[in-house]
Design a protein with these regions (language model features):
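Rossmann-fold cofactor-recognition segment
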Residues: 51-68
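Canonical Rossmann dinucleotide-binding motif of NAD(H)/NADP(H)-dependent dehydrogenases/reductases
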Residues: 3-36
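Catalytic loop of short-chain dehydrogenase/reductase
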Residues: 12-21, 92-132, 136-162
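Conserved Rossmann-fold cofactor-binding substructure of NAD(P)-dependent oxidoreductases
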Residues: 65-80
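Conserved hydrophobic beta-strands of the Rossmann-like cofactor-binding core
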Residues: 7-11, 87-92
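Helix N-cap at the beta1-alpha1 junction of Rossmann-like dinucleotide-binding domains, i.e.
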Residues: 40-43
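Local beta-strand N-terminus motif with an aromatic residue
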Residues: 56, 83-84, 112, 137
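Residues at the C-terminal ends
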Residues: 28-29, 79, 135
Length: 162
C-alpha cells in the first residue's frame, strides 16, 4: 500500500496500546503524512512522546466537544499540511463512574450526553468541519468495538455510544 503524499488525521491516540496508535503506525509505515490530535494539556506530554515514537511532526490540541477547537484544528492542518486524504476517528470517552456496575444504576443524562458527544457525534463534527478541505476520494473512518453489538461487562453507556 503506497500512501506517499497522503495526509491523514488520526484522533484518539492515548497510549501505545491504542488501536489508533497501531493505525497511525501502519499509515506511517506506508509513507502517509500522519497528523494527530490530543484533547488537552493533561494528555499533551504523553501524546507528544507517542508522536515522537512514530516520527509524527504534527500534533494539535483539540477538544472534540468544542466546535471552535475543531475549526482551529482544521485551520492549523490546512496551513501546515494542506487538504486531508483521510480522517480516522478513534476518540471515545465516558465518565469513569458510567463504566462500572449496573448500567441503570450509574447512568445520568449528562454522562450519557457526554459519552455520545465525544464517542459518536465528534465524528460528524469533524466531517462537517473538514468537508471543504478533503481531497477527492478522501476516506473518513470511525471505529467501534464489539461492545456496541454484544454485551460486554461494564462497557455500559459506551456500547450505546459506539
Amino acid at each position: 500500500m503506497n500512501l506517499k503524499g497522503k495526509n491523514v488525521l488520526v484522533t484518539g491516540i492515548a497510549s501505545n496500546r491504542s488501536i489508533s496508535f497501531a493505525i497511525a503506525k501502519i499509515l506511517k509505515d506506508n509513507d502517509a503524512n500522519v497528523v494527530i490530535s490530543y484533547q488537552n494539556d493533561r494528555l499533551k506530554e504523553r501524546v507528544l512522546k507517542l508522536a515522537d515514537e512514530l516520527e509524527i511532526g504534527n500534533a494539535y490540541q483539540c477538544d472534540l466537544s468544542i466546535d471552535h477547537d475543531i475549526a482551529t484544528l482544521r485551520d492549523n492542518i490546512k496551513e501546515d499540511c494542506g487538504n486531508l486524504d483521510g480522517i480516522v476517528h478513534s476518540a471515545a470517552f465516558a465518565p469513569k463512574d458510567h463504566l462500572s456496575g449496573k448500567y441503570l444504576d450509574n447512568i445520568s443524562r449528562d454522562g450519557f450526553a457526554l459519552a455520545h458527544d465525544i464517542s459518536s457525534y465528534s465524528f460528524t463534527a469533524l466531517a462537517k468541519a473538514f468537508k471543504n478541505d478533503l481531497n477527492e476520494a478522501a476516506s473518513l473512518v470511525t471505529l467501534s468495538y464489539i461492545g456496541s453489538n454484544k454485551v460486554v461487562q461494564n462497557y455500559n453507556v459506551m456500547g450505546v455510544a459506539k
